[in-house]
C-alpha cells in the first residue's frame, strides 16, 4: 500500500497507519502517538465539539506539530461557537466552497492567512475510481493494485455524496 501511495503523490517516505480506537481518543494516546510515531501533523474531522479534549491541549501540540481540521458546515447561521476551534487550527481544509465562506466569516475578526483556509473538494477522482466494465478488467486491476499479493480481507470505502457537497 505504501508503494502505491508514494507513487501516486511522488514521494518515497509516506507512513500510513490505521490505529483502531473506541471513540475519539484522549490526551494520553495523542501524547503517546506524537512521541512514538512522530507525525508531521494531526488531521481531524467531524464536529470540533467531539474534540474538546484535543483543543484543551492545542498549545502543547502546536509547539511540536500543526493541527489541521478538515471541516464541513453547510448552512447559515454562521457557527460562531466554532470560532475558538477554528482559531486554534493551523490549517482549515473546507469540504465545500460554502464551508470556506462560512469559516472565513466566522473568523472575520481573527482572519487567517490565505493559505490557512483552503477549499479541498469532497470526493474521489472519477478518473481513478470508476465502474469496471468486465471481470477481466477487474482482475487486471487487482493484480496491479495488490502487486500479485493475496489478501484475506480488503476494505474499500466509497462515499456517494460528492455532488451535494460541492
Per-segment meaning from a language model:
Residues 1-28, 32, 117:
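N-terminal strand-loop element at the rim of the active site
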Residues 19, 31-51, 66-68:
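Short N-terminal targeting/anchoring amphipathic segment
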Residues 42-61, 76-84:
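An aromatic- and histidine-rich active-site surface loop
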Residues 62, 69, 79-94:
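A conserved, positively charged/aromatic
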Residues 70, 95, 120, 157-159:
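Short hydrophobic "strand-cap" motifs at the C-terminus of beta-strands
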Residues 98, 123:
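Carbohydrate-associated surface elements
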Residues 130-148:
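A short helix/loop element that forms part of the nucleotide-sugar donor recognition site in Leloir-type
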Residues 148-165:
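Conserved donor-binding/catalytic core segment of Leloir-type glycosyltransferases
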